Amino acid sequence: MQHNTLSKHNQKLPFTRYDFGWVLLCIGMAIGAGTVLMPVQIGLKGIWVFITAAIIAYPATWVVQDIYLKTLSESDSCNDYTDIISHYLGKNWGIFLGVIYFLMIIHGIFIYSLSVVFDSASYLKTFGLTDADLSQSLLYKVAIFAVLVAIASGGERLLFKISGPMVVVKVGIIVVFGFAMIPHWNFANITAFPQASVFFRDVLLTIPFCFFSAVFIQVLNPMNIAYRKREADKVLATRLALRTHRISYITLIAVILFFAFSFTFSISHEEAVSAFEQNISALALAAQVIPGHIIHITSTVLNIFAVLTAFFGIYLGFHEAIKGIILNLLSRIIDTKKINSRVLTLAICAFIVITLTIWVSFRVSVLVFFQLGSPLYGIVSCLIPFFLIYKVAQLEKLRGFKAWLILLYGILLCLSPLLKLIE
C-alpha cells in the first residue's frame, strides 16, 4: 500500500488544459501595463543595476512564492486563507492574519476597480461610442462591476475561456514588440558602470521594483484551493499547484526579460529620461520604428486586457478573503455547515459590487494604497510564512536557509517606502 502511494506521488503528471488555464491566469495577474514601463526604469538606473537587482530579486521572488504556496498546501483544511491559518493556529490567529491578507488583496482590487471604470469610460468616449463620460454614471459603474463579478464568480473554467485569450494576446504583443526592436539594438546604449555607492543604492531600490514585475501571489491560494477541491489526494494537488507555479513563473520571467532587454538595447539613457518625464511607456518609444496607429491600437488593447485579466485574477483572492473572514466570525456563534453556500456566495458578490461602486464613486486617492502595497506584500508573502514555518510543527520541513531568505526579503519590502527617501 505504501509502495503504491509513493509510486503515485512520484509518477509523471500529465499537463492538462485545466493546468494551462491556471498558467494563463497566473501570467495574466503579473504581466501587463507595468511591464511596458520596465525598459524606461532600466534606462534610468542603468543596465548593470537592473541585472544585479534581477539576479537577486527574481530567484528570491520564486522562493517566496514557492514557500508561500507550500505553507498553505500543507493544511488538512483548505477552504480559504483564514481557514488554513485557523487550522494551524486557531480561530483568533486565523481572523487576525486573515484581515492582513484581506488588506493586501483589497489594495490591488481597489486600484484595478478605478482603472476598470475610468479607463473603459475614457475609451468608449475616445472611440466615439458615447458622447458622455460614463464614469460619472452610477448605473454604468454598477453594470460594469456586476458583469465582471458574475464572470469571475462563474468558476475557473469560465475564467479560463474569457481571461485566457486576453493573456495570450498580451504576451503576444509584448513578444512581438521585443522582436521588432532587435534590428535597432545599439550596444553603445549600455551605460558605464556607476559609482559603488550609487550602484548599491540603486540596486536596493530596484529589487522591490523587480519583485512587483513578477509577483502573482494574489492568485496562488485560490489556485491551491481549486486543486485541493479537484484532487482528493492532498500531495497530488500540491504537486500540480507547484508545477503550475513553476511553469508560469519561468514563462513570465523569460517574456519580461526578453522584452526589457530588447528595448533597453534600443534606447539611450537620454530617451529613457525623456520618457520618464513625459510619463510614457516603452511602446510610445517604439513609435520611432513602428507606425503610430499600430502603437495606439496595441497600447489600448494591452491596457484593457491587462486591467481585466488582473482584476479577474485578484478577484478570486478577494472573494476568498471575504468568505474566510465571514465564516470565521460566524463559526463562533453558529454551525457553519448549516450556512447555504450559494446564498453566501451571492451575498458576497453583491457586497463586492456595492463596495467597489462606492469606492469608485468617491474617487478616493490610491496614493496611500501604493505606499502600503509593498509592506502588505512583504508581511503576507514573507513574514507570515516565516512565522508559520517556525510556529507550526507540520511545517518543520520548510525550515532552513530559504525560510531566512524570505524573512530578509520581507523586511526589505516592508522598508521599501522608506528606502525611497534615500534616492
From Swiss-Prot:
It is a multi-pass membrane protein. One of its GO terms (molecular function) is transmembrane transporter activity. Residues 41-43, 115-133, 183-202, 268-293, 371 are periplasmic. One of its GO terms (cellular component) is plasma membrane. Keywords: Cell inner membrane, Cell membrane, Membrane, Transmembrane, Transmembrane helix, Transport. Its main location: membrane. It is found in: Cell inner membrane. Belongs to the amino acid/polyamine transporter 2 family. SdaC/TdcC subfamily. This is Inner membrane transport protein YhjV.
